[in-house]
Amino acid sequence: MQILRIAQLMALLATCASALPTSTGSRVYSRDVDQTQGGFSGSPTTNSPDSVAETGRLEARSGGSSSTETEKERKKRIKAEQNARIRQEEINRKPYQCPYCSDPTVFSHSDALGRHIYTIHRGMPIYNAKDPRKTAIPYNPPGRSTSIFGSEPF
């Protein structure tokens, strides 16, 4: 029990002694933040040979964060490339696209595209994405006339 108390007292004294200002400055560090304070001379601690920056622990922490930033950038780039590739494969699988939307919406068959154009774009012509000159069969909803201005039940 006494050995434990002596060890605690020595740890407390070591902590207090490292926090006192010296001629090269104070060495008060937390786990995450470098809290150097100027001592009597006002010089920073990083100039002293026994500072945390000289031992390499500070560089290891800062080096880890910069490498994770590059890792994040690399992951974002890979994800963007995969999304572009998936989008192109989706366009290749689904031949019909809406020419009226700003982001070309693609559909696997003309019926789905017809429903989209009829409800959103009010019956404009439908085009095939692989052959834009070819017009698909227009979508006629059940119970509706072919003209959008015709007699429609309300």
UniProtKB/Swiss-Prot annotation:
It comes from the Eukaryota. One of its GO terms (cellular component) is host cell nucleus. Induction: Expressed during multiple stages of host plant infection, including the prepenetration, early biotrophy, late biotrophy, transition and necrotrophy. Keywords: Host nucleus, Metal-binding, Secreted, Signal, Transcription, Transcription regulation, Virulence, Zinc, Zinc-finger. Residues 24-85 are annotated as: Disordered. This is Host transcription reprogramming factor 5. Residues 1-19 form the signal peptide. One of its GO terms (molecular function) is zinc ion binding. Residues 69-85 have a biased composition (Basic and acidic residues). It is found in: Secreted; Host nucleus. A zinc finger (C2H2-type) spans 96-121. Residues 35-50 have a biased composition (Polar residues). Probable secreted effector that translocates into the nuclei of host cells to reprogram the expression of targeted genes by binding on effector binding elements in rice.
